[in-house]
Amino acid sequence: MGAGGRRMRGAPARLLLPLLPWLLLLLAPEARGAPGCPLSIRSCKCSGERPKGLSGGVPGPARRRVVCSGGDLPEPPEPGLLPNGTVTLLLSNNKITGLRNGSFLGLSLLEKLDLRNNIISTVQPGAFLGLGELKRLDLSNNRIGCLTSETFQGLPRLLRLNISGNIFSSLQPGVFDELPALKVVDLGTEFLTCDCHLRWLLPWAQNRSLQLSEHTLCAYPSALHAQALGSLQEAQLCCEGALELHTHHLIPSLRQVVFQGDRLPFQCSASYLGNDTRIRWYHNRAPVEGDEQAGILLAESLIHDCTFITSELTLSHIGVWASGEWECTVSMAQGNASKKVEIVVLETSASYCPAERVANNRGDFRWPRTLAGITAYQSCLQYPFTSVPLGGGAPGTRASRRCDRAGRWEPGDYSHCLYTNDITRVLYTFVLMPINASNALTLAHQLRVYTAEAASFSDMMDVVYVAQMIQKFLGYVDQIKELVEVMVDMASNLMLVDEHLLWLAQREDKACSRIVGALERIGGAALSPHAQHISVNARNVALEAYLIKPHSYVGLTCTAFQRREGGVPGTRPGSPGQNPPPEPEPPADQQLRFRCTTGRPNVSLSSFHIKNSVALASIQLPPSLFSSLPAALAPPVPPDCTLQLLVFRNGRLFHSHSNTSRPGAAGPGKRRGVATPVIFAGTSGCGVGNLTEPVAVSLRHWAEGAEPVAAWWSQEGPGEAGGWTSEGCQLRSSQPNVSALHCQHLGNVAVLMELSAFPREVGGAGAGLHPVVYPCTALLLLCLFATIITYILNHSSIRVSRKGWHMLLNLCFHIAMTSAVFAGGITLTNYQMVCQAVGITLHYSSLSTLLWMGVKARVLHKELTWRAPPPQEGDPALPTPSPMLRFYLIAGGIPLIICGITAAVNIHNYRDHSPYCWLVWRPSLGAFYIPVALILLITWIYFLCAGLRLRGPLAQNPKAGNSRASLEAGEELRGSTRLRGSGPLLSDSGSLLATGSARVGTPGPPEDGDSLYSPGVQLGALVTTHFLYLAMWACGALAVSQRWLPRVVCSCLYGVAASALGLFVFTHHCARRRDVRASWRACCPPASPAAPHAPPRALPAAAEDGSPVFGEGPPSLKSSPSGSSGHPLALGPCKLTNLQLAQSQVCEAGAAAGGEGEPEPAGTRGNLAHRHPNNVHHGRRAHKSRAKGHRAGEACGKNRLKALRGGAAGALELLSSESGSLHNSPTDSYLGSSRNSPGAGLQLEGEPMLTPSEGSDTSAAPLSEAGRAGQRRSASRDSLKGGGALEKESHRRSYPLNAASLNGAPKGGKYDDVTLMGAEVASGGCMKTGLWKSETTV
């Protein structure tokens, strides 16, 4: 039993021995590697796999399952490392990039291979060789783009193939030829393009009983998006329509702003759909080729994974030329697709477009400050509650506007924005709606409702859209007869639109020509054998159409009329230039109508036989209208022919592009408008040739005008705007309200006239004057303002009277105002308020200029004719001169009143429809031309009287005339030369006597004259200025009112007159005046300052340039460095002693020398008196000082009369007997004596000039007006004798002095004593006594 027991125990052990290896394999620890896998494959797991079909039992020893998923394998494991019995290999979720040839060679038992979710991009041919038993292959979610038939070699038993989720977009035919057992395939990708390139797949699948997975969905084109490929029909797989690419990128894709010299690369990537796929580059639509010298580097295109094509373009050195659009275009047989990017190249100094606000019919846009070369964008104003979706109103649409490289805004693009006006927006909706025979009549009735308010249209696009709709409705007239009446009503309503809007619509889209052309073709489209007559009446249009037989035609006469209540001729309905008020639909009896009769009856518009009606137009068609028919249309079987008549109440729908008639119709340079109704006659389908007899037309005028011309509307082509021409039309007769004409053409006929209220030409308004006007006006303004500024800045130094100063400045200012406003605003008719302001300003300035000339002529005439009686002792002083206010009230107030009344009555009197801004003709007669005629008459009378006065006794007897008028420059110089030889003391006596007799025989107030020009010269200058201004005004008026050659001639004459006027005013009043030239020189400082210890300057003799007879006044106190307190002394107006005379001369000479601060050059010697002769009492020019000086000179004249009667002795007695206190005299007394002192304040020739260290700080007192007038008087013979006696007395009392004479003057002369005294005064304040020892000072 023991032995048997042992045998029984050994039997199970023998049975377990064969299973021991399997148990060891299953129980082996994992630490030594994956279970059942070689130690070299650490990331894989191996396990046994039960064969299919076995429900239990032990797995077969040769079947292995190897799982290598998620192990980051870069490539499949070597087949030799895997178990020989491997039937399933899972390699998903790794990083395998490619499959080499023979990657799985040796795995002959492999039945399932899973390679999904890798990054496989290339599969080499033969990659699956050796897998003869493979039944399932999963290559989904990789990056495979190239698949060929060689790819799947060695898979004869493959049943299921999954290649979905890759990047291919199409498959080549025969790609599955190496898979004979294939039953199911899934090839859906995000780029799958179901087009003609996949058309082979559907029949191939049907023939092979291949099932396309339901997950195989189309991605492109968009029409088949998300549809299963297996459910499509073969016809749906086509390559028609726009090219759609699954990939098309351009880098950079957004606008780039770069600087000159930068480097910019471009890269373009697109779908590769075949060998014909190409990428081309364009710059501003021009092809781009590689050019290394120009900095353009273009690389060859590269193809990636048989799916993408890439091209690179590099700009290595960017210049300004690179600005614009750069475009990448993908081209193939199916079509082209492009991507663009804008490049803006900035210069080193880039400019900006200013911020600007634009308001138009699309909205209100505020464009910000934008860099030059940049296109700015603004969001459109959207209407979210718009019931009808518009193509241009989609969300996100924008308006664009480009700022050019010069920093100027270009016109913006607002086409993607909605209209702000409700009517325009609705009419635009009508245009976008599709029209067919079922809805045409409904849309037409709805559109007519909107056109009933055509008078309130405010946008030209309203007319454009209605015209487009009328053209669309014309195509359905043959089917819907009711459309004829609706179309005529809409055209009639559009004639109520403002004429300016009609003109703009015609210019924009030829809208008016479209409407007229549609109406002319209605008869031929609507008439048929069942409808042989059409008659439609409307407010402004009437239509009559007949279907006639040419062989039975005997002539036709039609008259267009209306009821008298609807439009009496005097009311002139619809005249151009006037906005008609909105009108409701008029009653039937107020509409235009036709009345036609056969034959040729006599019809007169003046005696129309229908009661309570007025005939507006008539046309008579001759019986021979169809006599020129071709033989094909001759009897015995005459075809039907359409004859249509139209009448338009006015010519609002007939606008040529320039709104003017052609030269043949109106003559050269004429502006004409339609003054009658327009009547049309035309045929359709008749082949009418040249007429053998003319068409007789009679038309009633609804507007006044001149020079009527018969014309017909010539339409050059279907798309042409057309225009009026008179070729073939002749005017037979013209009465005040009716014109008769004959025409050899069928068409639209009217009478053109020069209308008094011609509508303004919008396109030409503000276009400007002839170019010659502007530079000549600028020259005139330059001369006038130079004169004005000179006289204002140098008021005190220019020797003109107060009245003369005011009159000259006002005259220059008003001439400048007239010329400037004329040149700058006469053509600004586009802006109503500006045009009215220009007209009012021109009206005022023209009248005021002529009135100032008249005032100046009156003052000059008064100077020549009025003389005051010689004053006697005890006579009261003369009255103060009248103020200048009266002249301002006359020359400025009268024009202001006239212009104010004219504007208050009707402000529109200053805005006619003429092409310039001026008064309407009738109001201008009473408001301008008649006042101008009166002003000219009075002015010319003054001119004539003044001229006769100069040629009469005044010219023969100077003593009885205006003795105070100075001679001209040449005469003054000669007079000074004659007196210079009479000795130095002659000047003193002459000055005394001339001053004393200044009031004797004075012709007028002393301030009323000119110190340099004689009355004759002044009168000649005024007359010249007057007539040059009239010539300039007349030529300027003709230059804007005429056309063509007369306009050019008048513009040139205006330029000549304006230039001559400006140069004359400047030359006469500035350049030729010595005092003005001296003031100019005084404004320029000397080149180098005087030396600190310069030798004294010699004083010129008083008779050389500062002669008391012909000399100029002393320098002003402004030149003194001591200011207003520089001279504490004052001399009485009558107590002129020899001490005062000497001290006055020395002090003033010293002040003149010391006040300059530096010596003058020799060329300015003797011109010191030119500086500020009129500056009275410390630089103040007050009228009160003038009056005091006037009275002082009058009182001094009484004392000087004694010297005049007593000769030299009386003068000496007067000088030596009277005494006065220097310190106690009032200031006015000093002014009176200093103005009359001989040679006061002048440099004395031959004597040394005191240096600033030697002279005193006192200021020279200027001469008064009376003193200057007295110095300009000629010395009498007694004065000359007295001068000799005084000279002897001066030599007798002189002392021998040792003072050096720098200019070589002889010692012991006239002013030797004065020189000595001046040296003493330098230290004693002009109070040292040295010459007259008998003088006493109180």
Swiss-Prot record:
It comes from the Eukaryota. Glycans are attached at N84, N101, N162, N207, N275, N602, N690. This is Adhesion G protein-coupled receptor A2. Belongs to the G-protein coupled receptor 2 family. Adhesion G-protein coupled receptor (ADGR) subfamily. LRR repeats lie at residues 82-106, 107-130, 131-154, 156-178. A motif (PDZ-binding) lies at residues 1335-1338. Changing R369A: Minimal effect on thrombin cleavage. Abolishes thrombin cleavage. Residues 1-33 form the signal peptide. Residues 1275-1292 have a biased composition (Basic and acidic residues). The modification Phosphoserine is found at S1107. GO terms for molecular function: G protein-coupled receptor activity. The record marks R369, T370, R398, A399 as: Cleavage. GO terms for biological process: canonical Wnt signaling pathway; cell surface receptor signaling pathway; central nervous system development; endothelial cell migration; G protein-coupled receptor signaling pathway; negative regulation of vascular endothelial growth factor signaling pathway; positive regulation of canonical Wnt signaling pathway; positive regulation of endothelial cell migration. Glycosylated. Proteolytically cleaved into two subunits, an extracellular subunit and a seven-transmembrane subunit. Cleaved by thrombin (F2) and MMP1. Also cleaved by MMP9, with lower efficiency. Presence of the protein disulfide-isomerase P4HB at the cell surface is additionally required for shedding of the extracellular subunit, suggesting that the subunits are linked by disulfide bonds. Shedding is enhanced by the growth factor FGF2 and may promote cell survival during angiogenesis. The leucine-rich repeats (LRRs) are important for potentiation of Wnt7 signaling. The RGD motif is involved in integrin ITGAV:ITGB3 binding. Residues 981-991, 1111-1126, 1264-1273 have a biased composition (Low complexity). GO terms for cellular component: cell surface; filopodium; intracellular membrane-bounded organelle; membrane; plasma membrane; Wnt signalosome. It is found in: Cell membrane; Cell projection, Filopodium. The lineage of its organism: Eukaryota, Metazoa, Chordata, Craniata, Vertebrata. The keyword Transcription does not apply. Residues 565-591, 958-991, 1088-1126, 1150-1196, 1218-1309 are annotated as: Disordered. Residues 190-240 form the LRRCT domain.
